[in-house]
Amino acid sequence: MNPEYIVFCVAIITLIVYLYLTAYSPSLIYVRSTEDNKLHLVQNKPDKVDAANLFAEIKRRNRELVKKFVEKFGDKDGRVNTLAKRYKDENIREAVPKVNQTSYSLNKGEKIVICVRSKDSKNELTDINTVMFVVLHELAHLMTLSVGHNDEFWENFRFILAHAIEWKLYTVENYEKKPKPYCGIKITESPLETKDIPKYIVSKETRESFTQF
C-alpha cells in the first residue's frame, strides 16, 4: 500500500476524532427555549428548559450590546468592528459537566463555552447577572486582537463592562465586599471601579484627545 495513502488516511481519521471530541458531547443536547422559541445547546438535565431560557437571555443581551456598540461607534472603532465581526449567537453553548471546566472562548469566538451551574451536587443554575459578568469577560477576548490577559484585554473588558452597565445589560456588583460563587470558584474582584465607568463610556479617540491637553 502506498505510504502516502496511509498517511492521508491517518490524518483524516485523526481530524474526524478531533472534531468529534471538540464539537460533540453526549451530555449536551439542543433544547428549545420557551422565551425565544430557538434551540440552545445545554446539558441534558431535568431543568434543561430553564437552562435554554437562560441562554436565550444571554444571547439577547449580547446581541443588544453589539447592536448598541455599532449604533454608537459605527465603523470608527476597531474594537467594536472586531467584536461585531466575531460574535455569533450559534457559537455559544453550555459547558460540559467536567470538574475543572469553567468558561472559555476558542479561536476568538469560534466556540464560546459558558459554565452556568454550581459545581456541587445540586448543579443549580447561576443567576443571570453573575453569568453576564463572565460572558462579558469572554466577549472581551473576542474584541482583543492579542492573546491572553494582557493590558489590551483588560482595557477592552473595562470598556465592555462600562457600556453594559450604562445600557442596563449588567448590574455593577462589589465583588470585593461580597464575593459571588461561580462554577466552583468565587468572583472576588472586578477590573472596573465604579468611579471609572464614565471615562470608558466615551470613545477611545475622545479619551486619547483628552490626554493630550
Give the predicted meaning of each segment.
Residues M1-M132, L142-F213:
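Active-site-proximal or metal-binding-adjacent scaffold patches in catalytic folds
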Residues E138:
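Walker B catalytic acidic pair
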